[in-house]
Curated annotation (Swiss-Prot):
<dbReference type="GO" id="GO:0005737">
    <property type="term" value="C:cytoplasm"/>
</dbReference>
<dbReference type="GO" id="GO:0051015">
    <property type="term" value="F:actin filament binding"/>
</dbReference>
<keyword id="KW-0804">Transcription</keyword>
<dbReference type="InterPro" id="IPR007123">
    <property type="entry name" value="Gelsolin-like_dom"/>
</dbReference>
<keyword id="KW-0677">Repeat</keyword>
<comment type="function">
    <text>Is a regulator of actin polymerization, required for proper myofibril organization and the assembly of cardiomyocyte cell adhesion complexes. Is a regulator of the length of sarcomeric thin filaments. Regulates cytoskeletal rearrangements involved in cytokinesis and cell migration, by inhibiting Rac1-dependent paxillin phosphorylation. May play a role as coactivator in transcriptional activation by hormone-activated nuclear receptors (NR) and acts in cooperation with NCOA2 and CARM1. Involved in estrogen hormone signaling.</text>
</comment>
<dbReference type="Pfam" id="PF23598">
    <property type="entry name" value="LRR_14"/>
</dbReference>
<feature type="repeat" description="Gelsolin-like 1">
    <location>
        <begin position="509"/>
        <end position="589"/>
    </location>
</feature>
<feature type="repeat" description="LRR 13">
    <location>
        <begin position="317"/>
        <end position="339"/>
    </location>
</feature>
<feature type="repeat" description="LRR 5">
    <location>
        <begin position="104"/>
        <end position="126"/>
    </location>
</feature>
<dbReference type="InterPro" id="IPR036180">
    <property type="entry name" value="Gelsolin-like_dom_sf"/>
</dbReference>
<dbReference type="InterPro" id="IPR001611">
    <property type="entry name" value="Leu-rich_rpt"/>
</dbReference>
<dbReference type="InterPro" id="IPR003591">
    <property type="entry name" value="Leu-rich_rpt_typical-subtyp"/>
</dbReference>
<dbReference type="InterPro" id="IPR007122">
    <property type="entry name" value="Villin/Gelsolin"/>
</dbReference>
<feature type="repeat" description="LRR 14">
    <location>
        <begin position="340"/>
        <end position="363"/>
    </location>
</feature>
<dbReference type="GO" id="GO:0005925">
    <property type="term" value="C:focal adhesion"/>
</dbReference>
<feature type="repeat" description="LRR 6">
    <location>
        <begin position="128"/>
        <end position="149"/>
    </location>
</feature>
Length: 1259
């Protein structure tokens, strides 16, 4: 394999993450004779493999995070070895060989996170050492001779050891740039060596027992020092030596005892990060405002108050992060809000009362943390001046126009809504007083008039204007070029730099060719060549050629010609596109490539479709995962099945989803959906998908798997964890290949910056794949090759060969295959390896009308049509309709009488247990919140008689007496009523029992109407003649008879909608405009209690009379009954029974204004609809926004399942409604209030009859 493969050309490979325990190291590594770097991190190695001896050109070796106990082996035989990284192993002193320090080129050594107790022997002989990392060991002493020869060191890390002192020879490290000594005692170190290290850039002395006495007196010579860390020490003030570091950029003084800062800090003019957290500071000096380059300032856990922050903090114009948590701040200076680049502001655990209003103008602010400030009141947000949200014009004029208002109304709404701009008026007055502007304007007018006079004079002298003055543009100049988007084919900087660019036509699309392959043309391909140069005037000019190969297909020829013209239009060039054919190139063309043109046999495939039968390989996959399923290929045999899992058998046009006996239903459903995606995206919906249960498989299923087994046994361990996929990026250079591995936990190659929650389990994301690259994804059981659309052809070819080598090199199952994926046509199994790879089209709902206008490149009427088509639809008509007027009492009584005249009979039933029992007539009109009722109503249907005169013409008078009159018809309506606290089992019981019986008794004449509490049919309510009573609990459930009960009588918009509902027994629920019934029971057999009908002083007299009748209906003579007016309540029974006297509402003005609107997107667009005046608490939809107008406030009620889009659109609709009502009802201006479900105030709940707790779903 190695002789004919690509292994000898590989210069670097990253095999980290593979399992090389127990001698599984691949032997083919010996064939990589050109290997320069090799990474074997996290591979489980216990010793260095022997194959390393064959890698004589190896320069960099990384074996971190393994179980190595020794580095003895062939390292000393590698003459070119430069770097050895063996961090996080089990190395001891004896495990580090002495002979590796005799290597002349060894310059990097990392032995950190091991078990060393002393410096490796002979380390001082490595004279060319540049980087030395011995941190996180147990070294307690550094020999004096170590740094005698290591004078070229650039990086030294000795942190997290047990060092007490430092050798004086460290002053020889004059080239050292980074020195890290964190977490060492260093109690005897005075750091006198520091001033000599003139090249030092980074100095970390965290937790090294630094005090004022053991710091150097001066560091003036360290002009390059930019990063200093002195945190977790015992400093009481800033060391004086730090003030001389004029180039300091990062300074960490956190976790010390510093109580004040000197004014000398203004010398740190280049400081970008300052950390003073966890000290004893009470204030910051004003000199800190002179640090104009400061980007990050941390002062957490100090004692700073408002006076401790300088007012000039706004001068820190580059400040990005400011953290002052756990201090004593009551306010923050308004100048802080002038730091326009501020992105993170943390002020939690303070004593904040409010924040400056300018906080809302920090447009780049991403994090504002003000938690644990109990008295904080956020300043109001400024009014948004933009009328258009989500491409919807929410201006009052536009919405009135859409609602069909008259032009006068629309104009009035616009005229009365524009507030005076006093600032603009001042500016106008100032401009009027400024005579300089007037003089300038007069000069401009005089100049224009002089030019016009000279032109007229020349016409009079010379007659008509010359022809050249009236010369028109050429016909082709007047043509309007279409606004086409070429950015998908050509980059932005194309043609902007002198040079040559070449594109190859592939699948109708131009793909840019690397500069190394310029002048090399495939005989079956076509190319576009652009030469950019500067003309004699220094302006950019271009030459555009398109080259045709002798064996090129028609689609490539056409594509080259078309895209050459597209390139000319994209550049705005005026040159011609020149056709060049293979073997007949012009001299002008060959000069572009210095007469060095070569032809290569072959070419890419044609872009035209070829009709051939697709061959699908048969694969068997095991499905695992909970939230997002993933597939792992397993051997194609019946023994691979396991009853714990779901398996997917893909035979091409037959896809089987097999569910094991112990597999979950959710996993089966997701596997079925996955199969549907395969069918739709890869099989053109031609495959048949079959779901199979264990022990119910058809014979053809077992034929594919080689026969049915005797028993399907569990063989996958319970702690099964899939092998982590490894993503490689193929690199190609001049004569070599590289295969680096992408660490997608720490990768910075994403198109968007990754957040921590994006890859919580080291998951791959689609953003890692670059369209210009080629990648290999090694999933152990499968190897995928992903080819980007703009990747070079040679890299593609090398990746295909390299994928085969990788597949055969490492130990993997026999059924593993290499699968090729082109960008945009990836298979579903490949996509499942990535997190949230979804091909759903992204829609931007935040576009406004201006952005829509900019997108349309049309003009005139066509442009307007495009804008109207792109605008999002919204219906706010309901907000501008008048409130539904209350129905007069006489009209309601007449309607009630008519409906009752048609009623022939009514039978009632109530659900008792699991059956419906007949309801006694004396209980008609009494309902309970936990019960379900059924009422069978029989109505007479009027019959239309024929005209007597027409009858007389057809029949004689004698026949009229004998003629039979037609029988009157009837109709049956079944009303099903369900209480708020009743379960849906009542409806199911009715559907399968009583309804079937009624349908058999009245075939074709039965209508079923389902109703819930307080959402009843008006016709149904009319049968109870305003005596509709709703009790709490169940009908036959014996409640505590000693507890008083209170009933509220209320009419909503019509006398038909009158209900008497039991509410909480609390005097705060009383209202002077309503009537209430209070039952106070006694513990006596003779007298069961006393019942009061309480009549408010402003109650309607008709309702007061009705309340007395309802009281007599509800209670028999065993109760004492009494009608009392407000203010005449007896103390003994009434106030004691109702639970003491409390304040209550004395008016119900809200009943005259109350309106409830629903804002929803359920129609596919944003629409507002109004509920009828008889609304109730259950009309509050949890997934929508509700607007409640009570005449003074407009409440915006937000449910728990409401989308953010609905919230934002509803807010704008609410503002439009308030603006409209301000002009319609000037005496009652509304205020906007926000209410979240479960936190409704009393002014909101009183608009609903009998408000109580929300219904909850059964557990």
């Amino acid at each position: 394999m190695a002789a004919t493969g690509v292994l000898p050309f590989i210069r670097g490979v990253d095999l980290s993450g593979n399992d090389f325990k127990g001698g599984n190291f691949p032997e083919h590594v010996k064939s990589m004779t050109s290997l320069r770097w090799l990474k074997l991190n996290r591979t489980g190695l216990c010793y260095l493999p022997e194959e390393l001896a064959s890698l004589q050109k190896l320069e960099h070796l990384s074996v971190s995070h393994n179980s190595l106990t020794t580095l003895h082996g062939e390292l000393s035989s590698l003459p070119n070895l430069r770097a050895v990284v063996a961090r996080a192993n089990n190395l001891k002193n004896s495990g580090v060989p002495d002979d590796i320090f005799q290597l002349d080129d060894l310059s990097v050594l990392d032995l950190s996170h091991n078990q060393l107790t002393e410096i490796p022997r002979d380390l001082e002989n490595s004279r060319n050492m540049l980087v030395l990392n011995l941190s996180h060991n147990s070294i307690d002493n550094i020999p004096n001779q170590l740094f005698i020869n290591l004078t070229d060191l650039l990086y030294l890390d000795l942190s997290d050891n047990n060092l007490d002192s430092l050798p004086p020879q460290m002053r020889r490290l004059v080239h050292l740039q980074t020195l890290i000594l964190n977490n060492n005692p260093l109690m005897h170190a005075q750091l006198r060596q520091l001033p000599v290290m003139v090249s030092l850039q980074t100095l970390h002395l965290r937790n090294t027992q630094r005090t004022q006495n053991n710091m150097p007196t001066s560091l003036e010579g360290l002009s390059n020092l930019t990063d200093v860390d002195l945190s977790c020490n015992d400093l009481t003030r800033v060391p004086e030596c730090l003030y001389s570091l004029v180039n300091l950029k990062r300074l960490n003084l956190s976790s010390n005892q510093i109580s004040e800062l000197s004014l000398c800090i203004d010398q740190w003019t280049k400081l970008e990060t300052l950390n003073l957290s966890r000290n004893q500071l009470t204030s910051l000096p004003s000199a800190i405002c002179k640090l104009s380059k400061l980007k990050k300032l941390y002062v957490n856990s100090n004692k700073i108050d408002f006076d401790g922050l300088p007012s000039g903090v706004g001068k820190l114009s580059n400040l990005v992060e400011f953290m002052a948590a756990n201090n004593n701040l009551e306010l923050v200076p308004e100048g802080l809000c002038r730091c326009g680049k501020l992105k993170k502001l943390v002020l939690n655990k303070n004593r904040l009362v409010t924040l400056p209003e300018a906080i809302h103008f920090l447009t780049e602010l991403e994090v504002l943390d003000v938690r644990e400030n109990p008295n904080l009141v956020m300043p109001p947000k400024p009014v948004d001046r933009t009328a258009e949200w989500y491409n919807i014009d929410f201006s009052l004029q536009n919405q009135l126009r859409l609602a069909g208002a008259s032009p006068a109304t629309v104009a009035a709404a616009g005229g009365g809504n524009s507030p005076r701009d006093h600032m603009a008026r001042k500016m106008r007055l100032r401009r009027c007083k400024d005579s300089a502007h007037d003089d300038q304007a007069k000069q401009v007018l005089k100049g224009m008039s002089d030019v016009a006079q000279e032109k007229n004079k020349s016409i009079e002298e010379n007659g008509d204007l010359k022809y050249s003055d009236l010369k028109t543009k050429r016909w082709d100049k007047n043509l309007e070029k279409p606004q086409l988007d070429y950015s998908e084919f050509f980059l932005e900087d194309v043609g902007q730099i002198p040079g040559v660019s070449v594109w190859q036509i592939e699948n109708f699309i131009p793909i840019q060719v690397d500069e190394a392959f310029h002048g090399k043309f495939y005989e079956a391909d076509c190319y576009i060549i652009l030469k950019t140069f500067l003309d004699e005037n220094g302006a950019l000019n271009w030459q555009i050629f398109y080259w045709i190969g002798q064996d090129a297909t028609l689609d490539k020829k056409a594509g080259a010609a078309i895209h050459a013209v597209n390139l000319r239009n994209y550049l705005g060039a005026e040159c011609r596109t020149i056709r060049e054919e293979m073997g007949d190139e012009s001299e002008e063309f060959t000069v572009v490539f210095d007469h060095e043109i070569s032809y290569i046999e072959g070419g890419t495939a044609s872009g035209f479709y070829t009709v051939e039968d697709t061959q699908y390989p048969t694969r068997l996959y095991r499905v695992y995962g909970k939230k997002n399923i993933r597939l792992e290929s397993v051997p194609l045999k019946a023994s691979s099945l396991d009853p714990q899992f779901v398996f997917l058998l893909d035979t091409g046009l037959e896809i089987y989803v097999w569910r094991g006996g112990n597999a979950t239903l959710g996993g089966t459903t997701k596997a079925r959906l996955f199969a549907e995606k395969i069918n739709k995206n890869e099989r053109k919906s031609k495959a048949e998908i079959t779901t199979l249960m264990q022990n119910q498989e058809p014979p053809e299923f077992w034929e594919v798997l080689g026969g049915q087994p005797e028993e399907i046994k569990k063989h996958v361990p319970d702690d099964f964890t899939p092998i982590r996929p490894k993503l490689y990026k193929v690199g190609l250079g001049l004569g070599y290949l590289e295969l680096p591995q992408i660490n997608y936990k720490l990768s910075v190659e994403h198109k968007d910056k990754l957040k921590l929650d994006v890859v919580p389990e080291l998951r791959l994301v689609q953003g890692l794949l670059d369209t210009k690259g080629v990648y290999i994804l090694d999933c152990w059981s499968d190897v995928f090759i992903w080819i980007g659309r703009k990747s070079p052809r040679l890299v593609r070819a090398a990746a295909l060969k390299l994928g085969q080598e990788v597949c055969g090199m490492l130990h993997r199952p026999k059924h593993a295959v290499v699968i090729r994926n082109l960008e945009g046509t990836e298979c579903q199994v490949f996509k499942s390896k990535f997190k949230n790879w979804d091909d759903v089209l992204k829609v931007d709902y935040t576009r406004n009308a201006e952005s829509v206008k900019q997108e349309a490149g049309l003009s005139g009427k066509v442009k307007k049509d495009v804008e109207q088509k792109d605008q999002m639809k919204a219906d706010l008509t309901a907000l501008f309709l008048p409130r539904q007027p209350a129905m007069p009492l006489t009209e309601a009584e007449q309607m009630m009488e008519e409906w009752n005249e048609d009623l022939d009979g009514m039978e009632g039933f109530v659900l008792e247990g699991k059956k419906f029992a007949r309801l006694p007539e004396e209980e008609f009109g009494h309902f309970h919140t936990q019960d379900c009722y059924v009422f069978l109503c029989r109505y007479w249907v009027p019959v239309e008689y024929e005209d007597d005169k027409e009858k007389g013409k057809e029949k004689g008078e004698e026949g009229d007496d004998e003629e039979k009159q037609p029988e009157e018809d009837f109709q049956c309506v079944v009303y099903f009523w369900q209480g708020r606290e009743a379960s849906n089992m009542g409806w199911l019981t009715f559907t399968f029992s009583l309804q079937k019986k009624f349908e058999s008794l009245f075939p074709g004449k039965l209508e079923v109407v389902r109703m819930t509490q307080q959402q009843e049919n008006l016709k149904f309510l009319s049968h109870f003649k305003r005596k509709f009573i709703i009790h709490k609990g169940k009908r036959k459930l014996k409640v505590d008879s000693v507890q008083p009960s209170l009933y509220h009588i209320r009419t909503n918009g019509s006398a038909l909608c009158t209900r008497t509902i039991q509410i909480a027994t609390d005097s705060s629920n009383l209202n002077s405009e309503f009537c209430f019934i209070l039952k106070v029971p006694f513990e006596s057999t003779d007298n069961q209690g006393i019942v009061y009908t309480w009549v408010g002083r402003a109650a309607d007299p008709d309702e007061a009379k009705l309340a007395e009748e309802i009281m007599n209906t509800m209670f028999d003579d065993t109760y004492s009954k009494q009608v009392i007016n407000e203010g005449e309540e007896p103390e003994n029974f009434f106030w004691v029974g109702i639970g003491s006297q409390k304040t209550y509402d004395e008016d119900a003005e809200y009943m005259k204004y109350a309106r409830l609107f629903r804002c929803s997107n359920e129609k596919g667009y944003f629409a507002v609809s109004e509920k009828c005046s008889d609304f109730c608490q259950d009309d509050l939809a949890d997934d929508d926004i509700m607007l409640l107008d009570n005449g003074k406030e407009v409440y915006m009620w937000v449910g728990t399942q409401t989308s953010q889009v609905e919230i934002k659109l509803s807010l704008k609709a609410c503002q439009v409604y308030i603006q409209h009502m301000r002009s319609k009802d000037t005496e009652n201006p509304r205020k906007l209030r926000l209410v979240r479900k479960g936190n409704e105030p009393h002014c909101f709940t009183r608009c609903f009859h009998a408000w109580s707790a929300f219904k909850t779903a059964p557990a």
